[in-house]
């Protein structure tokens, strides 16, 4: 939390498999530790989201054998060969639940309080009365632990249950942060995540999209529709390979700090230094975008303020491009007198820029400029 506060971050997600939340989708064991963490975070003006959904449940939950007693009402069993992302089924599951159980995430603890133990989970049925149990659990977490929101990793929750969850969360902040793994492959149904989750988008606040998205190989149109969240009114973040900051700035996206490449704070600082919350974003698709690159493979998004603007460009082409950005001053709102590359940590070296002489962008490379009146 101290690190997050030092970087100016305002939300922290507590993932399962950690000392504060050791068992997946069951944050009801280390409750005192979790509560103390949430209270300390609040002191630092940071909200805490906890990993909590219903797709799978842990063998450590108090109700695990009550689930078994209900037959197939709660536990989802495979039909035919089935499929599991994990190779093999833990012996504990087959011993107590039979060969048709569907294994899910598992964590083997190598140190700490639970050293030598394992968090073994199994898939449960969607749209069962377990959804009611989940909502009551969420209400308890808000009233007794003080969490600000939840982090869900994909989901089997339907629209009605997510809407109910949102109403419960509204008591204390209301954030739902959702991660999506790329479902456009056979074992995941070869489907678009945006299509899959369209009905719950109105209740989400933040997206993290996600494993399996090779950002540099995707078209700008695909990124807009399937990754950015913009058509649904949601903010998104990148994951795979640490993301690509210059692509991200075309869509107001950033990497997520603390996962993979730790460069997200450099973009956060750029946003703070520029005052991006007071700007108007005009994406490369916007009819009133004041910047034209003159090259269809080089896209530019502009963040406008009175007397200054950020111009964010990325070359989607396979070859270097030489461009001379054409700026429509009537759309920009001022006549730019200076242009420079802001220094952005490990992402971009600072320096002067001459828009009249043109700029070179390497293949799959980007640049961020700031212009001022």
Predicted regions, residues:
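Active-site-proximal substrate-binding groove within the catalytic cores of carbohydrate-active enzymes
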Residues: 159, 166-346, 363-367
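C-terminal beta-strand-rich structural cap/linker in extracellular carbohydrate-active enzymes
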Residues: 350-373
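Active-site and adjacent substrate-binding regions of carbohydrate-active enzymes
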Residues: 126-182
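A cross-family glycoside hydrolase active-site/sugar-binding cleft signature
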Residues: 14-15, 49-53, 151, 177-181, ...
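The substrate-binding groove and active-site-proximal loops of carbohydrate-active enzymes
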Residues: 15-31, 115-132, 145-156
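Active-site-proximal loop/turn and secondary-structure-junction residues that shape catalytic pockets
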Residues: 18, 54-58, 155-158, 182-184
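Aromatic- and glycine-enriched glycan-recognition loops and surfaces
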Residues: 1-88, 132
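Active-site-adjacent "subsite" loops/lids of carbohydrate-active enzymes
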Residues: 50, 54-145
């Amino acid at each position: 939390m101290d690190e997050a506060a030092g970087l100016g971050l305002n939300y922290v997600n507590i993932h399962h498999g950690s000392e504060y939340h050791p068992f997946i989708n069951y944050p009801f064991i280390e409750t005192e530790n979790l509560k103390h963490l949430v209270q300390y975070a609040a002191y630092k003006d940071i909200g805490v989201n906890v990993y909590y959904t219903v797709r799978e449940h842990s063998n450590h939950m108090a109700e695990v054998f009550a689930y078994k007693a209900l037959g197939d009402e709660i536990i989802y069993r495979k039909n035919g060969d089935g499929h599991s992302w994990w190779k093999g089924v833990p012996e504990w599951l087959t011993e107590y639940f039979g060969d048709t159980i569907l294994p899910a995430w598992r964590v083997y603890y190598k140190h700490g309080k639970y050293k030598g133990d394992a968090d073994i989970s199994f898939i449960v049925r969607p749209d069962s009365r377990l959804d009611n149990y989940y909502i009551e659990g969420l209400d308890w977490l808000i009233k007794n632990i003080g969490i600000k929101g939840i982090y869900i990793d994909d989901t089997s929750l339907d629209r009605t249950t997510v809407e109910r969850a949102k109403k419960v969360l509204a008591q204390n902040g209301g954030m739902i942060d959702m991660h999506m793994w790329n479902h456009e492959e056979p074992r995941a149904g070869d489907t678009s995540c945006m299509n899959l989750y369209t009905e719950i988008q109105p209740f989400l606040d933040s997206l993290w999209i996600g494993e399996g998205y090779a950002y540099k190989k995707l078209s700008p149109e695909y990124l807009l529709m399937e990754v950015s969240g913009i058509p649904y009114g949601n903010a998104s973040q990148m994951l795979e390979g640490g993301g690509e900051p210059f692509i991200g700035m075309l869509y107001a996206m950033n990497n997520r700090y603390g996962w993979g490449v730790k460069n997200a704070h450099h973009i956060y600082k750029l946003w703070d230094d520029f005052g991006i919350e007071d700007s108007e974003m005009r994406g490369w698709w916007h009819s009133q975008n004041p910047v034209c690159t003159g090259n269809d493979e080089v896209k530019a998004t502009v963040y406008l303020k009175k007397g200054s603007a950020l111009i964010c460009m990325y070359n989607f082409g396979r070859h270097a491009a030489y461009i001379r950005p054409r700026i429509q001053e009537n759309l920009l709102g001022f006549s730019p007198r200076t242009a420079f590359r802001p220094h952005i940590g490990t992402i971009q070296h600072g320096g002067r820029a001459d828009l009249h002489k043109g700029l070179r962008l390497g293949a799959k490379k980007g640049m961020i400029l700031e212009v001022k009146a």
